[in-house]
Amino acid sequence: MQSPEFLSASSRLTVDLTALADNWRAMNERSGKARAAAVLKADAYGLGVVHAAPALYAAGARDFFVASVEEGADLRPLVPDGRIYILAGMWPGNEELFFENDLVPIINSEEQLAVFMAALSERGDHPCVLHVDTGMNRLGLSPEEALALAHDPARPASFSPVLVMSHLACADDPGHPMNRYQLQRFREVTAAFEGVPASLANSGGVFLGADYHFDLTRPGIAVYGGEAVNGAVNPMKAVVTAEARIVQVRTVPSGGTASYGASVRFGRDSRIATVAIGYADGYHRSVSGGGVTLRQAMPSGAFGFLHGMKVPHVGRVTMDLSLFDVTDLPEAAVRAGDYIEVFGRNVVIDDVARAGGTIGYELLTSLGRRYHRTYVGGA
């Protein structure tokens, strides 16, 4: 039975934890001999790490990646014996958080390596990960720096990484030559760290095949139901559904206009549903389609789903409200108080993102605080 708050909310978000767990299991299986971690940064991609982490742990995940040491400290009580990796690494002043919470810093630079080694000299042994940049040019030691470290006879015995990793720049495009280039560079580095486990594949990398799996894969967006490979059928289950209440239904005569700037003109008598969702809720203004000047050259706008039919968004997304054309639905079927699915099982979040010229990651992590959130299922 749904709560009164769910039934009366202006907008609501339903997170299917069973689908989340199933997606992780599917990625773990696709990883073959490697084991799959789970990426939980940005509050589990906006869905709530307090709920997502226990579900993934119950499904079998034991390795977790987050962005910052603060995220790691918050995650620790949720996965007591999990290994938590911190992508941003260790900096002067936050060393104690790593030791207190048993967090694994990812070493991205020689400067961070120096901070880590100084911390070891004061506090004793602690695991770390060596991040090598193989072409992304964002974070990581260069392959040359990593190889020099591997062959340095003066390297302290206390420096013993538990993982060597890199990050693929073009894994969502299986045919991109950068994938093979990065794989080759990574193999050159891992050969110098004989016996140290290795990790290269993100979500898209898992789909590239066994050559990219090594010992640990790092699926992120795929676990949350998003597309990992451009142009391919997405095999993952939808995890999140966003719905918003119809506040009012209006009739606009043929030739009439609606929204800011009179940005949409109707060629027939039309019925328009005003819906309680806007860019303050992470429903980006750019999904308006041609109703926004800078979008004139981009695809048409997004759709919603109501009573078994897709209904087009019209006009401009505003802070709190959006308009959907419900003319093709029976008049008696659409009433104020009904809910339109904005994305979920029937409206793919990546399609909404494409309509806005962005990606599903950005929509998920932009979700505002006004949704009534409901978590269903589990591992």
UniProtKB/Swiss-Prot annotation:
Catalytic-site annotation from UniProt: 41, 260
Broad EC category: isomerase
Record keywords, A-Z: Isomerase, Pyridoxal phosphate
Cysteine pairs bridged by disulfides in the record: none
Highest taxon, organism lineage: Bacteria
UniProt entry tagged with the keyword Lyase: no
Cofactor: pyridoxal 5'-phosphate
Residues at which substrate binds: 138, 319
PROSITE patterns with a match to the protein in the record: ALANINE_RACEMASE (PS00395)
Cellular component GO terms held in the UniProt record: cytosol
Keyword check for Isomerase: yes
Catalytic activity as recorded in UniProt: L-alanine = D-alanine
EC number, UniProt record: 5.1.1.1
An example molecular function term from Gene Ontology annotations: alanine racemase activity
Gene Ontology biological-process annotations: D-alanine biosynthetic process
Modified residues (N6-(pyridoxal phosphate)lysine): 41
HAMAP family listed in its UniProt record: Ala_racemase
Function: Catalyzes the interconversion of L-alanine and D-alanine. May also act on other amino acids.
Family, similarity comment: Belongs to the alanine racemase family.
PANTHER family: ALANINE RACEMASE (PTHR30511), ALANINE RACEMASE, CATABOLIC-RELATED (PTHR30511:SF0)
Name of the protein: Alanine racemase
Gene that encodes the chain: alr
